[in-house]
Amino acid sequence: MAELATIARPYAEALFGVAEAGDIAAWSTLVQELAQVARLPDVLSIASSPKVSRAQISDLLLAAVKSPLKDNAQAKNLVQMLVDNHRLPLLPEIATQFEELKNAREGAADALIVSAFPLEGAQLDGLVASLERKFKRKLKPTVQVDSSLIGGVRVTVGDEVLDTSVRARLASMQTALTA
C-alpha cells in the first residue's frame, strides 16, 4: 500500500499543478471518474491484454467518463502516460492523493462518521458543525452505520480518531476494571 502511494504521489502532485491553472473541481471529477473505471476488473484485464493497443485502452478509458475535461489535451496525455507505463492500477490512489491535496488547499478534510444509527438532516448538520469547531477545519462528511457501536459515534479525520461510542466506553471500563 505504501509503495502504491509513493509511486502515485508524483502523478497526483503534477495533476494538481495542472488543475490549479484551471478548474480544480472539474479535474477532481475527472480523476474520480477515471479511478472508478480503473477499478473495474474488466478494464484491468483489457488493459493487460496484448491484443489491445495502448491507444485503444486510452480511448476506452476516456470514453467511459462523463467529464467534459476528457477531451482536454492534458487529460488525454495523463491517461496515455498511465497506459504506456502500465500504471492504470494507480488511478484510485492518484485520485485519493489528489483529493487530499485539494482538501489541504481548501483547508478542509474528509471525515468518516460511523454511527450506531442513521444520521440525517439537522442531526447530521449539528454534529458536523460541532466537529468542525473541534477539528478547526471544514469537514466533508461520509456517514456509515455500524450497529455494533451500540450508541454514539466514531469519527475519523485524517489520522485523528474521536470515539465516543458506547462500545469504546465499555471497552475502557473493562480495561480499567481488569487492570
From Swiss-Prot:
Q: Give GO terms: molecular function aspect only.
A: proton-transporting ATP synthase activity, rotational mechanism
Q: Which Pfam families match?
A: OSCP
Provide GO CC annotations from the record: plasma membrane; proton-transporting ATP synthase complex
InterPro entries associated with the record: ATP_synth_OSCP/delta_N_sf (IPR026015), ATPase_OSCP/dsu (IPR000711)
Membrane topology per record: Peripheral membrane protein
Give its localization.
Cell inner membrane
Alphabetized, the UniProt keywords read: ATP synthesis, Cell inner membrane, Cell membrane, CF(1), Hydrogen ion transport, Ion transport, Membrane, Transport
Described function: F(1)F(0) ATP synthase produces ATP from ADP in the presence of a proton or sodium gradient. F-type ATPases consist of two structural domains, F(1) containing the extramembraneous catalytic core and F(0) containing the membrane proton channel, linked together by a central stalk and a peripheral stalk. During catalysis, ATP synthesis in the catalytic domain of F(1) is coupled via a rotary mechanism of the central stalk subunits to proton translocation. This protein is part of the stalk that links CF(0) to CF(1). It either transmits conformational changes from CF(0) to CF(1) or is implicated in proton conduction.
Concerning its family, UniProt says: Belongs to the ATPase delta chain family.
Q: How does it assemble?
A: F-type ATPases have 2 components, F(1) - the catalytic core - and F(0) - the membrane proton channel. F(1) has five subunits: alpha(3), beta(3), gamma(1), delta(1), epsilon(1). F(0) has three main subunits: a(1), b(2) and c(10-14). The alpha and beta chains form an alternating ring which encloses part of the gamma chain. F(1) is attached to F(0) by a central stalk formed by the gamma and epsilon chains, while a peripheral stalk is formed by the delta and b chains.
UniProt name for this protein: ATP synthase subunit delta
UniProt source species: Paraburkholderia phymatum (strain DSM 17167 / CIP 108236 / LMG 21445 / STM815) (Burkholderia phymatum)
